[in-house]
Regions:
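Long, low-complexity, Lys/Arg-enriched
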Residues: 1-50, 63-119
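Short glycine-rich phosphate-binding loop at a beta-alpha junction
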Residues: 52-57
Length: 119
């Protein structure tokens, strides 16, 4: 078992753009993730790589970087920032950090709410 639990849920942005929501949760007793955890980490099966991926969860920067790289074959990859949302509960913005799609560009902020299924 990995020290980082990954859960994927099909979802859409507030504008209706479909994507895969990748929720990351550290599951160690101390709440601390070590770099060695990356060696046993696997992206969940069933990802729809023709859609974008939003990575969300409390993570060290190096772990988020690893997940961005691991998801690079997706149409686009974004990271979630709750400070970029609106007054809706669970809202935030997903900042696009990599793209192969004409529909989004690096630096775009996609408004979304965290799916209930990952809470």
């Amino acid at each position: 078992m990995s020290d980082l639990k990954l859960q994927v849920v099909s979802h859409q942005t507030q504008a209706g753009l479909p994507y895969q929501h990748l929720h990351a949760q550290i599951v160690t007793p101390t709440g601390i993730l070590t770099p060695a955890a990356l060696k046993s980490l696997a992206i969940p099966t069933g990802m729809i790589w023709s859609q974008g991926v939003v990575i969300e969860g409390k993570l060290p920067l190096w772990a988020a970087g690893y997940l961005v790289h691991a998801c690079h074959t997706a149409a686009w990859v974004a990271t979630f920032d709750p400070r970029l949302g609106n007054d809706r509960p669970q809202s935030g913005g997903a900042v696009v950090v990599a793209t192969h799609s004409p529909h989004v560009a690096e630096g775009d902020v996609l408004l979304l709410t965290i799916p209930d299924a990952v809470l």
